[in-house]
Amino acid sequence: MSRRCQVRGTKPEFGNNVSHSQRHTKRRWNPNIQKKRYWVPSLGRKVTLTLTPKAIKEIDRRGVDIVVAEMLTRGEKI
C-alpha cells in the first residue's frame, strides 16, 4: 500500500536522526494513513480511500460527493 493520502497528497518526509554526538543517519516520517470506506451517492457505490485524519475531517466538513468529484477531475483512480 502506498503511504500517500488520496485527497491531500500527503507523502512521507525525509530527514536525519541526529544523535547526541551529532552523527546523522537517514530516516523517514510516515503520514498517519487510514483506510476508510464511504458511500458515494453520485457513483451509487461504496469506495475505499486511503486518507490522513485531516482528509477525513475535510470529507466530514465538505461532503464526500464534492471531495470525490474533485479527485475524479484530477484523474485520481477510485
Swiss-Prot record:
Tell me where on the tree of life, at the top rank, the source sits: Bacteria
- Report the GO molecular function annotations: structural constituent of ribosome
Q: What is this protein called?
A: Large ribosomal subunit protein bL28
Sequence intervals crossing the membrane: none
Lineage here is: Bacteria, Bacillati, Actinomycetota, Actinomycetes, Propionibacteriales
Which key words tag this protein in UniProt?
A: Ribonucleoprotein, Ribosomal protein
According to its UniProt entry, the protein's GO biological process terms are: translation
Q: Annotated region Disordered: where?
A: 1-28
One cellular component (GO) term of this entry: ribonucleoprotein complex
Q: Which organism is it from?
A: Cutibacterium acnes (strain DSM 16379 / KPA171202) (Propionibacterium acnes)
Q: Which family does it belong to?
A: Belongs to the bacterial ribosomal protein bL28 family.
